[in-house]
Amino acid sequence: MISPINMKPIVEDNFLTPADFDPLKKELFGDFFPWYFHPSVATDDDREPSHFFWTHIFFERDKGIASNAYKKLHPIFNKLKPKALIRVKANMYSNQGRTIEHHAHTDYPFKHKGALFSLNTCNGSTHFKDNIKIQSVENRMILFNPSLPHHSSTCTDAPVRVNIVFNYF
């Protein structure tokens, strides 16, 4: 599977089999899965009170594996076939009663690949250049160029919006 570098995002629904997807979703939506609060979504200086989210780091290039749940991602790695990981993290955006669109950002300033995997269906979305808006749909993978500006939004029809972002070569 190839992530686009200069193309429009690629969407693949039903990315994982139910046998691989269900345990991953159960883990991230479980009562004991650790989520960590961040007061800004896009950049550190974005301190609007409604622009917060929760994250969980699975892997970071300078630290390596950072989560006991990392092994649950192997079915995704088997399909993405990364040569090297930069970062893998889960994002959880709380329903705030209205849709909040976060500021545009790039994940890293250098050329690499990106994949965004949705854990639940909701009316939250990810926005890309050329007014491309892709809804969060359970078990949907979006392959995109994360060094180009993009932004997220919250949802209003579910308690949370949860996805996993993969940055890799």
Residue ranges, per PLM feature:
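A short coil-to-beta-strand element that immediately follows conserved catalytic motifs
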Residues: 81-91
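Short beta-strand segments enriched in hydrophobic/aromatic residues
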Residues: 92-94, 119, 168
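A short hydrophobic beta-strand segment most commonly corresponding to one strand
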Residues: 115-117, 158-169
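A short beta-strand-loop-beta hairpin characteristic of the jelly-roll/cupin
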Residues: 98-104, 110-112, 118-137
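Short beta-strand His + acidic residue motifs that chelate non-heme Fe in jelly-roll/DSBH
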Residues: 103-105, 149-157
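Non-heme Fe(II)/2-oxoglutarate
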Residues: 1-83, 96
